[in-house]
Regions:
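GNAT-family acyltransferases
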Residues: 1-99, 167-175
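Charged catalytic carboxylate motif
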Residues: 13, 117, 143
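Conserved catalytic-core motifs of GNAT/GCN5-like acyltransferases
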Residues: 136-137, 152-169
Length: 175
């Protein structure tokens, strides 16, 4: 498994990845808004956006600089997940979103990909000096809370989110 920065060569596979979420009526997290770009714009414009997102000078507030990656299985070059790694936190992300958003395609769940992908994301942040990584999930999402706990997450708060209209949990993963 490897983190791969999106390129034009992954256009068809990325479109297929997003389509699978729609087919399973499943929520898409950590895609760097790829799903919205495919509905309203183009994959190519999304590539421009995620490249701009890396540099704080190009990011319009309240957004923050971020890296978006595909999580790719090397044997067949299949995108099994996506992860959005935020290099800084806004007030909202500090309270409700955290440093990392991620998802695994519905047909590839329960194979520990999320645990391994989150670990890789935490390592990226650790390399740039962020040693306390915040990650949130819906309280009802036991798979995601398990993924976070498997990476050493410590529950730091639980609260009702007016934005998401549900209880969320915020965890800290400390190096």
């Amino acid at each position: 498994m490897k983190l791969v920065f999106p390129t034009l060569e992954y256009k068809e596979k990325a479109t297929e990845y997003i389509r699978e979420f729609y087919e399973y009526n499943s929520e898409i997290n950590g895609s760097g808004a790829l799903d919205r770009f495919l509905r309203e714009s183009t994959y190519e414009e999304w590539l421009v956006k995620i490249r701009k997102d890396i540099d704080i000078a190009n990011v319009e507030k309240p957004r923050v600089p971020a890296l978006t990656y595909f999580y790719v299985r090397e044997e067949d070059d299949r995108i099994v997940g996506m992860i959005n790694i935020r290099l800084a936190l806004s007030d909202f992300l500090r309270e409700e979103g955290g440093h990392i958003g991620y998802s695994v395609r519905p047909t590839e769940r329960r194979k520990h990909y999320a645990t391994d992908m989150l670990k890789a994301g935490v390592e990226v942040l650790n390399t740039i000096g962020i040693n306390e990584v915040l990650v949130s999930c819906d309280k009802e999402n036991l798979a995601s809370s398990g993924t976070i706990l498997n990476n050493g997450g410590r529950l730091i708060k639980e609260k009702y989110s007016e934005t998401f209209k549900e209880m969320i949990q915020m965890y800290a993963i400390t190096k």
